[in-house]
């Protein structure tokens, strides 16, 4: 098996020396390919992301990703162990001297996209996952970071303990809320199905609220099993949003009338509100979605406010929802802007910034820092300058969790002194709940659900059961016809659509399921229409290619992968849509 893994590594161009063995394909990140491997030194399974540094632009994006992931340390964020160069060498702050970089990170069993492909989650599972997603977003946003690519494929799940972790920060961006970043933000990064209306209208001007819109779309998808707004292109995406999300503010109405008047109803009434679009979702969840999926980002809940909503009350615990103690500042964003300008000339110009580069690459989460050197969360008691700047819509400086931080003499000292098992109000209504908590490293994860974890006790047996014939889902029919200008486009797209598109790489093994049946009653897995990865075929063809490396054309890997996956007619449309989302 080790020889097969080494062959796979050579086929994909992985050169990490002999430390990592048993490579297996996992998928593709935004900036590179991802393989699983076994770290023989640490004796653990890891995921290794390869980033090719082919030019100044790719190097700039790699530096930004490494800078961000090295500083983020949270239970609901995929942990990064180290960043290596060719042959497993240490980068030592000299990224610009290498042609490739490897990010060694925590291995996660599956992702949310794979789980959703197997069927609708129970509401209990959806609520638990949404809580952890907001818990991770609260920390990310407090660090002045935008993820910018939240979608089920970038949300990873451990089916053993139901822990959710946010991953793939290849498109993440540092944004200091006290300064205007207008003109320096990239266009259209979020996958269009999870793209907010503000991002569709003004792709260069957005805030942390774009992540919250994506989170709301993901919650609706978990509750219903299908994408909330599955537009074939940006025009249809905006049309679907306007059919469901009300436009309240006058400035938004004026902009829509100026930009796309044919798509706007004269009465500004929505055709299918969320309560009608999602008839099987309970009223409390609908209220939660209505507060997240607002047309204007100023009216949208923040991650911290979402954690305090009644829908999250079974898990809400402000004392166990930490924020970043070392957020990124405007200086970090300026470094990126300077590097962007420097990359336009030549790579050697980057030698002018060795300090900022090496400090970001050599930072460790456990590094000791003096309290005076740590910048507090800028949202806690800070007052923005009264200048003409873009104001972040997080107008919640007096929220309960921030008052908790301000009243404590030190948030770090409070974290060490607090006994979470006794001081936290878990609001679960069960006197024995604390006795069932999942403990790790002498502290509980208060959001762990023993009952839901028990529901997974038979997923391995169910995964080995013979699959039943899959029943193709009928496409969702529309009740109303689109606007006149949109009709021709919709008719053209209709011929290529066979259902809701989903952009996710094909699995290479049977994926674990979240069983909805009680413990002791495993649920058989329904056979899906997703393509299956044949490892034996892949290995045999890979060995043939390895014997003739000089004859390997650039597109040979695509032919190899295609030969190992069974084709389905519907996959062609999905593949085309998925490739367009990776721009």
From Swiss-Prot:
EC number(s) recorded for this UniProt protein: 2.7.11.24
SUPFAM superfamilies: Protein kinase-like (PK-like)
Effect of residue 168 to A: Kinase defective mutant, abolishes activity
Domain spans labelled Protein kinase: 20-312
PTM statement from Swiss-Prot or TrEMBL: Phosphorylated at Ser-186 by PAK1, PAK2 and PAK3 resulting in catalytic activation. Phosphorylated by MAPKAPK5 at other sites.
Domain of life: Eukaryota
Segments of skewed composition (Basic and acidic residues): 366-379, 391-410
Family matches, as InterPro entries: Kinase-like_dom_sf (IPR011009), MAP_kinase (IPR050117), MAPK_ERK3/4 (IPR008350), Prot_kinase_dom (IPR000719), Protein_kinase_ATP_BS (IPR017441), Ser/Thr_kinase_AS (IPR008271)
Keywords, alphabetical: ATP-binding, Cell cycle, Cytoplasm, Kinase, Nucleotide-binding, Nucleus, Phosphoprotein, Serine/threonine-protein kinase, Transferase
Motif (SEG motif): 186-188
Inhibition and activation profile: Activated by phosphorylation at Ser-186.
Region (Disordered): 366-410, 495-531
SMART domains named in the record: S_TKc
GO molecular function, one term: protein heterodimerization activity
Record keyword Membrane present: no
Binding residues annotated for ATP, in chain numbering: 26-34, 49
Localization annotation: Cytoplasm; Nucleus
Chain positions found as Phosphoserine: 186, 430
Active site: 149
Domain notes: The FRIEDE motif is required for docking MAPKAPK5.
Family: Belongs to the protein kinase superfamily. CMGC Ser/Thr protein kinase family. MAP kinase subfamily.
Quaternary data: Homodimer. Heterodimer with ERK3/MAPK6. Interacts with (via FRIEDE motif) MAPKAPK5.
Name of the protein in its database record: Mitogen-activated protein kinase 4
């Amino acid at each position: 098996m080790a020889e097969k893994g080494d062959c796979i590594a050579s086929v994909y161009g992985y050169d990490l020396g002999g430390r990592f063995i048993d490579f297996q394909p996992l998928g593709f990140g935004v900036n590179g390919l991802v393989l699983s491997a076994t770290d023989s030194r640490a004796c653990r399974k890891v995921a290794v992301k390869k980033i090719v540094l082919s030019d100044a632009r790719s190097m700039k994006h790699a530096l930004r990703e490494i800078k961000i992931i090295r500083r983020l340390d949270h239970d609901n964020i995929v942990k990064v162990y180290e960043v290596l160069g060719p042959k497993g060498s240490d980068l030592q702050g000299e990224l610009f001297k290498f042609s490739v970089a490897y990010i060694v990170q925590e291995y996660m069993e599956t992702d949310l996209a794979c789980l959703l492909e197997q069927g609708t989650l129970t509401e209990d599972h959806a609520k638990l996952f949404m809580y952890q997603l907001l818990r991770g977003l609260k920390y990310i946003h407090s660090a002045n970071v935008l993820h910018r690519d939240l979608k089920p494929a970038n949300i990873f799940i451990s089916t053993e303990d139901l822990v959710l972790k946010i991953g793939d920060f290849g498109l993440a961006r540092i944004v200091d809320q006290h300064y205007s970043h207008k003109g320096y933000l990239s266009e259209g990064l979020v996958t269009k199905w999870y793209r907010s209306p503000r991002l569709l209208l003004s792709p260069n001007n957005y805030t942390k609220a774009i992540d919250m819109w994506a989170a709301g779309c993901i919650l609706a998808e978990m509750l219903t099993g299908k994408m909330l707004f599955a537009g074939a292109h940006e025009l249809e995406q905006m049309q679907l949003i306007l059919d469901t999300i009300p436009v309240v503010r006058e400035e938004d109405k004026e902009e829509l009338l100026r930009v796309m008047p044919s798509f706007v109803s004269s009465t500004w009434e929505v055709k299918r509100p969320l309560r009608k679009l999602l008839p099987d979702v309970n009223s409390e969840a609908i209220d939660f979605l209505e507060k997240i999926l607002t047309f204007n980002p100023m009216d949208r809940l923040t991650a911290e406010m979402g954690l305090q909503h009644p829908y999250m009350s079974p898990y809400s615990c402000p004392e166990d929802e930490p924020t970043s103690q070392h957020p990124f500042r405007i200086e970090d964003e300026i470094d990126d802007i300077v590097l962007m300008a420097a990359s336009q000339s030549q790579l050697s110009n980057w030698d002018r910034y060795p300090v900022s580069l090496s400090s970001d690459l050599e930072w460790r989460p456990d590094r000791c820092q003096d309290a005076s050197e740590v910048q507090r969360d800028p949202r806690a008691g800070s007052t923005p300058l009264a200048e003409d700047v873009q104001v972040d819509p997080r107008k919640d400086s007096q929220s309960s969790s921030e008052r908790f931080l301000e009243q404590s003499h030190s948030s770090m000292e409070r974290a060490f002194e607090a006994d979470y098992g006794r001081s936290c109000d878990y609001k679960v209504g069960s006197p024995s709940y604390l006795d069932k908590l999942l403990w790790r490293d002498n502290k509980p994860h208060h959001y762990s659900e023993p009952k839901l974890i028990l529901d997974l006790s038979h997923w391995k047996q169910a995964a080995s059961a013979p699959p039943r014939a899959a029943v193709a889902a009928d496409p969702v029919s529309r009740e109303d016809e689109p606007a006149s200008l949109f009709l021709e486009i919709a008719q053209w797209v209709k011929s290529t659509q066979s259902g809701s598109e989903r952009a996710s790489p094909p699995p290479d093994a049977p994926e674990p399921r979240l069983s909805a049946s009680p413990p002791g009653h495993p649920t058989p897995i329904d056979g899906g229409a997703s393509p299956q990865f044949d490892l034996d075929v892949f290995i045999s063809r890979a060995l043939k290619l390895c014997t003739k490396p000089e004859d390997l054309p650039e597109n040979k890997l695509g032919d190899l992968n295609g030969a190992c996956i069974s084709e389905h007619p519907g996959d062609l449309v999905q593949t085309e849509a998925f490739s367009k989302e990776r721009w």
